[in-house]
Amino acid sequence: MISNGQAFFQAPSYLFTPIKLNLALHVVGQRADGYHLIESLVYFSLSGDCLSCTPFGSNRFVLTGPFADELVSDAENLVVRAHDFMCNTFPECAKPAFFQLVKLLPVASGVGGGSGNAAGVLSLLRQQWALDCSCEKLAEMSLVLGADVPMCLFALEYQQPLFVKGIGQDITRLKEACSLAMVLVNHGQQIATKTVFKALEKRDHPPLKIDSAALKTVDSLVEALQETRNDLFVPALKIAPQLSEVLCALDESGALFSRMSGTGATCFGIFKDKQAAQQAALFIKAMYPDWFVKPIVTLAKL
């Protein structure tokens, strides 16, 4: 029910939410409360879901897009939860809003789609409400929404790759890192994060060590990544054996390096340039028309 017809004449604020890509992910421990400690090299692309926010007479949320049917549109959705969080955290500024999310990314796919959406809400409302709250402070508070939300908020604010430690709260900006041309591939199987972590047999792997100088060029980064891991790949592979086929498809299309992101099932390939990535995406989509295939360029310094 539309309670304020004038709202449609107010210009909406919108953004494309971050795609989060764990180029390396080491699980180095586990806290007493069960949270796993990680060290991760994380790159981003602002080409995820499309989120818009319009001041409205009452709160409303509409979910559309090719992957909308796989999500709930009620109070459990991270867009709604993030709005509730902002209203409760800044009650003196809280205002009702109409959010529309066009779900363009696969669900439960290891690229932080839900966390990116939550970060998008925080970023839009921080601007609309003219909050006197730094990105760093808001990121610290937003950890209650999920471990990936703070880093996604940093991606929207600073548009740079990050080195992330702890449960996701210890964030270092990588200001000298180069941009990457990549292809994302998802074969369609959802993989629950909790299921992958539960299947992880070893929780105290060696830490992630990578020289910041290696991040300056594609070739040096690819070489450095050979000495890193995604410690969640082995348990994810037991759940989704087709991950091996996805990685083979990326390698056969000319990827310089390929790996699963996060807990899966999305895998990425790094290519020498944007043209090579676009050609590879066309090749993979032709071979596997039912797969999600997306060429992207990651955020980095200008």
UniProtKB/Swiss-Prot annotation:
EC number in record: 2.7.1.148
Q: Which residues form a coiled coil?
A: none
Q: Does the keyword DNA-binding apply?
A: no
Q: One Pfam match, by short name? A: GHMP_kinases_N
The pathway this protein participates in, as annotated, is: Isoprenoid biosynthesis; isopentenyl diphosphate biosynthesis via DXP pathway; isopentenyl diphosphate from 1-deoxy-D-xylulose 5-phosphate: step 3/6
What InterPro entries would the database entry show? GHMP_kinase_C_dom, GHMP_kinase_C_sf, GHMP_kinase_N_dom, IspE, Ribosomal_Su5_D2-typ_SF, Ribsml_uS5_D2-typ_fold_subgr
Q: What class of enzyme is it?
A: transferase
Which keywords accompany this UniProt record? ATP-binding, Isoprene biosynthesis, Kinase, Nucleotide-binding, Transferase
Domain of life (superkingdom): Bacteria
Q: Which GO terms describe its biological process?
A: isopentenyl diphosphate biosynthetic process, methylerythritol 4-phosphate pathway; terpenoid biosynthetic process
Binding residues annotated for ATP, in chain numbering:
P106, V107, A108, S109, G110, V111, G112, G113, G114, S115, G116
In the UniProt entry, which residues are flagged as the active site? K20, D148
Mention one GO molecular function: ATP binding
Q: Which reaction does it catalyse?
A: 4-CDP-2-C-methyl-D-erythritol + ATP = 4-CDP-2-C-methyl-D-erythritol 2-phosphate + ADP + H(+)
Q: Does the keyword DNA-binding apply?
A: no
Q: Which NCBIfam families does this UniProt record tie to the protein?
A: ispE, PRK14608.1
> What does the sequence similarity comment in the record state about its family?
Belongs to the GHMP kinase family. IspE subfamily.
The record's function comment reads: Catalyzes the phosphorylation of the position 2 hydroxy group of 4-diphosphocytidyl-2C-methyl-D-erythritol.
User: Could you tell me what this protein is called?
Assistant: 4-diphosphocytidyl-2-C-methyl-D-erythritol kinase
The organism encoding this protein is: Bartonella henselae (strain ATCC 49882 / DSM 28221 / CCUG 30454 / Houston 1)
